[in-house]
């Protein structure tokens, strides 16, 4: 935000002159009038002079901070301290802080993260501890000419404020203390003012035991080196050189993505989304997963290729000795060694190096301290839960206390001479291994908003005894009464947030009326309200194994919006007239009032359909829906829609202890496909309607066509099994997958479809009008246009689509901002992110509960080889949805060799393991490391000499795994 002053109480006018230099080096002079005021508050609560200036005094010095070096005081902080240590100011130990206008503008210009934190602290999170003082508009503190020749302009303005406030507060016995970062600055200012301190010096003199945590946060900066150490990484190019390189095409901008198999390798997806460059070793140059980086292509003779080798920090740390783990000598570590193997030209890929960071993706990371054998050591390595993030070096004197806890650490900076980024301890989450702590880590790591709904959100809810009223309308069109229709819902067992229900009835010789009825969430969630803002922030409901984190409060999600059986509910209905061949004759949309005749599970609905004795209206409607769904499915697959596969399991939970009793692979029923087909049809129909009405701002969902190169793992795997995969079109891909059937290996087709899923791009929400129309298509569904309409209880995208459709048919007014393309794009950015994070959180929850389930158990299972690497195999266990690495120690003596090109493992020349073939494994939990128990696979059949333990790759998070 920008700071402004009131337009009254002007004391005088001064001329303020600034000089600036353009890119060609020419110097310009700019002069502007400054209206100086005498009514700007000093911020002191006791100040009788300033109390009538209409501001809220914040500095309540009657409850002073106790500091051994100064008495009653307030703090004036310089910009460098705020920029370097902005996280420290979250602490309530630092209060009665004054941020001058000069410092505010300096931080804003130099450091966006620090500015955002400062803005949040001053005006939201800690406004009772901060006061912004407009020193450059105050008649007593503004100075155009220099009064102190030995001070910089910034130092002089800071000192001017301190001297004024010292005099102004004299009768209150309060002194301002100036906090600075730079030693030279402190010495210069002390020539003119008594109370100047380093930030660290001030904290050291606090009379509060909590100061140690603040000192730990500062310690990382003191250990960053004096510039004489060996430089490990290249220096970044300047901002100007990067911009010039991007303009000329010699430098590209892209997103840095670390390999899940080899932490020394990464890929940069260039901004055009059509190009990717490979980066390895020190050429990653301090980039962290998710950073936006500037990259430069290396000369072709320096190109290389992925090692096809499993390199996980967990693996390498597991085989190190305890002494190695505690070793502080970074030069002795081989993490930064470059790969030695020279690739043939035919095997290489476009290889680049990071030459600069355009935007950091740093955040606060959950994890744990690695053990150190150096007694009393201050420097420690922090192991993030997210495996794609490097170890972080922190300094703390609380290591013994924190060793059994999950903690949060932030990265501060990454010097060229440090193998690891340097950071600081932020806070503790809880005891390592406890269910509550590990779940909290999971949610924090995936940035899942999970705080209880605020009072302002709950105030938006209707009364719990609310009942529908057919005459209650939000727009000019009346709500249609559909309570006489035989409508039912079909959902998973235990579902309480029922979004959708269906009906089907024959209305002619070859005509059927089919309806999809969706919960009318937008009747309750109105634009611009606190509940709408919260739903927009959360973006989606998150489903974990042992809990659900709702997008909307329970009163709506599980009651008033949920289409429960035998209860009247508001709905948004999409009703088709179609033939028995599923040819649509007409479609209509209206807000409605329905009464579901039954809330069925998938299993119960299947049972009713299959039982010829069931002849009631619900059974007849379900059978009609099933017949039509099979026609719709055949048509979609005929057009090239893909049928993909993934590993899905469900847990039978003990809800008292929140522990898994049983793990089951999800079974697919025809009723799953039945419901899916009509949800897809409704989404497509609504997409067509809102795009027709709002071609520049309809919220749609597209699935980009994957790059041909991304299919390589699939194509190679199929080729080694004797099948050809066609990737030139969606239909070609679908048809070739259908042909990949091996009677000796019934799982082969499913495994290939799982590999296909991994080759796909991510489907995304977008605003119509922001990409060319041909790119609107949804590749996986083989349809030209698509959106999400059918789940507004758990997806905010559907809420927006409901509003667009309601406006299009006159069922509701067009709300402010609804038709704004820029606003739609902003919403899409957030819900794309939230959707992705919710998926990752769900998978991490499965893996965490698999570990809990196997604690104290050992089981032998069938697995399938999903990949062969130079030092191990990747094994998928369908029964538990578990995919892990078994590391093989090959040697000439054992006769074991791995052929990555042929995707096989050989013993004495004979192939014993091939990709996509079954193996027998033993599953258990390895608890040798008390801090980090993990699932372990051991190969039982075929027996291979030199077997090591596994390290789970199915989730990058490593939450307890």
From Swiss-Prot:
- Mainly localized where? nucleus
Sequence ranges assigned to domain RNB in this UniProt record? 479-809
Q: Which GO terms describe its cellular component?
A: cytoplasmic exosome (RNase complex); nuclear exosome (RNase complex); nucleoplasm
GO BP term (any one): rRNA catabolic process
Pfam families reported in the protein's UniProt record: OB_Dis3, RNB, Rrp44_CSD1, Rrp44_S1
Domain CSD2 span(s) in chain numbering: 381-447
Write out the entry's keywords from A to Z: Exonuclease, Exosome, Hydrolase, Nuclease, Nucleus, RNA-binding, rRNA processing
- Zinc as a keyword of this entry, yes or no, is no
Q: Where in the cell is it found?
A: Nucleus; Nucleus, Nucleoplasm
Which Gene Ontology terms cover its molecular function?
3'-5'-RNA exonuclease activity; endonuclease activity; RNA binding
Tissues where the protein occurs: Ubiquitously expressed.
The record places domain PINc at: 73-188
Stretches with biased composition (Acidic residues): 325-337
Is Membrane one of the keywords UniProt gives this record? Answer: no
Q: Which residues form the CSD1 domain?
A: 232-338
Q: What is its EC number?
A: 3.1.13.-
Disordered, as annotated region: 322-346
Q: Which Gene3D superfamilies match?
A: 2.40.50.690, 2.40.50.700, 5'-nuclease (3.40.50.1010), Nucleic acid-binding proteins (2.40.50.140)
Q: What does this protein do?
A: Putative catalytic component of the RNA exosome complex which has 3'->5' exoribonuclease activity and participates in a multitude of cellular RNA processing and degradation events. Has both 3'-5' exonuclease and endonuclease activities. Involved in regulation of antisense ribosomal siRNA production.
Record's subunit section: Component of the RNA exosome complex.
The UniProt similarity line reads: Belongs to the RNR ribonuclease family.
Protein name in UniProt: Probable exosome complex exonuclease RRP44
> Species name for this entry?
Caenorhabditis elegans
Lineage summary: Eukaryota, Metazoa, Ecdysozoa, Nematoda, Chromadorea
């Amino acid at each position: 935000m920008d700071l402004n002053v009131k337009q009254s109480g002007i004391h005088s006018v001064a001329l303020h002159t600034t000089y600036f230099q353009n890119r060609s080096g020419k110097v310009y002079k700019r002069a502007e009038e400054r209206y100086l005021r005498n009514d700007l508050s000093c911020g002191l609560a006791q100040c009788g002079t300033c109390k009538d200036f209409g501001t809220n005094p914040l500095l309540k010095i009657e409850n002073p901070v106790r500091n051994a070096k100064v008495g009653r005081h307030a703090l004036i902080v310089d910009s460098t301290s705020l920029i370097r240590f902005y996280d420290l100011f979250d602490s309530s130990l630092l209060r009665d802080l004054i941020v001058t206008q000069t410092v505010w503008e300096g931080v804003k210009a130099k450091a966006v993260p620090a500015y955002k934190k400062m803005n949040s602290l001053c005006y939201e999170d800690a406004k009772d501890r901060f006061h912004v003082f407009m020193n450059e508009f105050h008649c007593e503190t503004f100075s155009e000419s220099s009064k102190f020749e030995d001070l910089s302009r910034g130092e002089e303005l800071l000192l001017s404020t301190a001297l004024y406030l010292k005099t102004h507060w004299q009768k209150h016995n309060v002194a301002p203390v100036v906090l600075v970062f730079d030693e030279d600055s402190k010495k210069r200012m002390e020539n003119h003012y008594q109370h100047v301190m380093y930030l660290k010096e001030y904290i050291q003199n606090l009379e509060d035991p909590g100061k140690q945590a603040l000192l730990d946060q500062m310690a990382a900066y003191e250990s960053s080196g004096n510039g004489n150490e060996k430089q490990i990484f290249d220096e970044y190019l300047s901002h100007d050189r990067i911009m010039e390189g991007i303009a000329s095409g010699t430098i590209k901008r892209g997103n840095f993505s670390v390999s899940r198999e080899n932490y020394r390798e990464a890929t940069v997806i260039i901004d055009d989304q059509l190009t990717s460059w490979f980066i390895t070793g020190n050429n990653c140059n301090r980039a962290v997963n998710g950073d936006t980086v500037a990259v430069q292509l290396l000369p072709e003779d320096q190109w290389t290729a992925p090692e096809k080798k499993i390199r996980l920090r967990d693996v390498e740390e597991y085989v190190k000795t305890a002494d190695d783990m505690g070793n502080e000598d970074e030069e002795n570590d081989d993490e930064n060694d470059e790969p030695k193997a020279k690739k043939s030209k035919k095997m290489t890929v476009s290889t680049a190096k990071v030459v600069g960071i355009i935007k950091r993706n740093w955040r606060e990371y959950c994890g744990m301290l690695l053990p150190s054998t150096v007694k009393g050591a201050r420097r420690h390595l922090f192991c993030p839960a997210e495996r794609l993030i490097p170890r972080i070096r922190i300094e703390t004197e609380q290591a013994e206390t924190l060793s059994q806890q999950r903690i949060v650490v932030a990265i501060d900076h990454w010097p060229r001479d440090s193998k690891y980024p340097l950071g600081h301890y932020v806070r503790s989450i809880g005891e390592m291994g406890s269910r509550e702590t590990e779940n909290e880590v999971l949610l924090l790591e995936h940035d899942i908003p999970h705080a209880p709904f605020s009072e302002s959100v709950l105030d938006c809810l209707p009364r719990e005894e609310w009942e529908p009223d057919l005459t209650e309308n939000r727009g000019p069109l009346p709500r249609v009464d559909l309570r006489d229709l035989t409508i039912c819902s079909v959902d998973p067992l235990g579902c309480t947030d029922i979004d959708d229900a269906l009906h089907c009835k024959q209305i002619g010789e070859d005509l059927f009326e089919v309806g999809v009825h969706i919960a009318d969430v937008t009747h309750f969630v109105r634009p611009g309200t606190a509940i709408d803002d919260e739903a927009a922030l959360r973006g989606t409901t998150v489903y974990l194994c042992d809990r659900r984190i709702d997008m909307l409060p329970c009163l709506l999600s599980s009651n008033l919006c949920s289409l429960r059986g035998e209860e009247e509910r508001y709905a948004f209905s999409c009703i088709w007239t179609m033939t028995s061949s599923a040819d649509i004759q007409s479609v209509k949309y209206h807000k409605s009032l329905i009464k579901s005749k039954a809330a069925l599970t998938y299993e119960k609905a299947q049972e009713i359909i299959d039982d010829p004795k069931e002849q009631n209206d619900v059974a007849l409607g379900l059978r009609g829906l099933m017949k039509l769904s099979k026609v719709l499915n055949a048509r979609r697959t005929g057009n090239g829609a893909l049928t993909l596969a993934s590993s899905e399991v469900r847990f039978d939970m003990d809800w008292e202890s929140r522990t898994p009793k049983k793990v089951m692979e999800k079974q697919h029923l025809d009723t799953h496909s039945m419901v899916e087909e009509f949800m897809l049809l409704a989404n497509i129909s609504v997409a067509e309607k809102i795009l027709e009405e709002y071609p520049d701002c309809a919220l749609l969902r597209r699935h980009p066509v994957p790059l041909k190169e991304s299919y390589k793992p699939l194509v190679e795997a199929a080729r080694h099994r004797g099948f050809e995969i066609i990737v030139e079109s969606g239909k070609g891909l679908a048809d070739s997958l259908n042909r990949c059937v091996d009677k000796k290996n019934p799982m082969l087709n499913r495994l290939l479809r799982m590999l296909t899923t991994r080759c796909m791009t991510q489907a995304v929400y977008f605003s119509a009008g922001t990409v060319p129309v041909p790119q609107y298509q949804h590749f996986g569904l083989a349809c030209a246009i698509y959106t999400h309409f059918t789940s507004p209880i758990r997806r905010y995208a559907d809420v927006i689509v409901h509003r667009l459709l309601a406006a299009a048919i006159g069922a509701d007014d067009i709300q402010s901002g609804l038709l704004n393309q820029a606003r739609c794009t902003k919403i899409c950015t957030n819900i794309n992110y939230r959707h992705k994070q919710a998926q990752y959180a769900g998978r991490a929850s499965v893996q965490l509960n698999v570990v809990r389930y196997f604690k104290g158990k050992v089981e032998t299972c069938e697995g399938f080889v999903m990949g062969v690497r130079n030092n191990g195999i990747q094994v998928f266990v369908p029964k538990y949805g578990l995919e892990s690495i078994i590391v093989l120690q090959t040697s000439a003596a054992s006769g074991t060799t791995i052929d990555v090109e042929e995707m096989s493992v050989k013993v004495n020349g004979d192939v014993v393991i091939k990709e996509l073939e079954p193996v027998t494994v033993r599953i258990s939990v390895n608890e040798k490391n008390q801090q980090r128990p993990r699932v372990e696979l051991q190969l039982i059949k075929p027996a291979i000499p030199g077997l090591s333990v596994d390290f789970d790759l199915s989730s990058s998070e490593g939450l307890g795994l």
